[in-house]
């Protein structure tokens, strides 16, 4: 039987990571903070890329300046507009856009792409040439009628669906990016975050939306800000592997539902550092 091999081929120098973002970049900022805290980092963010040039919307340039990382922006709506289009639905144009991005990534010798609130679907020129990972705000290991129940949902929409489905908690997941959205191999699931009490009797839709948004903000701090940097480090250290038939392993053990981050030493303690109490003024 052939042993599984690391999904990232180890090198002498740190793994070179590109962070893709479209908005606030809170996850990317936490990755950079974590990298900076390490004495001998196994990875480095060497490029920040954005598809949004509006500085009021995207904070990529600000984060890049803060941490001394090269920053490039190719506004995707401007790109589509140059083709006479007013939305970004045409995936043939997207492939052309991604082909240009891929050329930039090659110049930086990128090993891994971390999508951090990047709001454009990426195509084959990206994920077939570079190991690409994404974070999803719901538990993708839950299957219903043969499909991932919470695939294709974004932000508080994923949390709201979990709440309405009667889930007692949420988990964020990190997965490998493939052609079908949210359907790639599951790398990791975060520590669980319980809902605040029994929500089953709440019928006010607006109230449920506010609760979902609040829950997501806590989830970012407790689950995502802790998990994303750690998973990148674990990839860089060769601890995620894959066998010839595509089964994913963590530390040589098969993990069909991804590694459970609540079982990784230090994760739960680190999560609590981010778990400050929010008030409703935090929800915008």
Q: Could you say what each language-model-derived stretch is?
A:
Residues 1-284:
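One-carbon transfer enzymes
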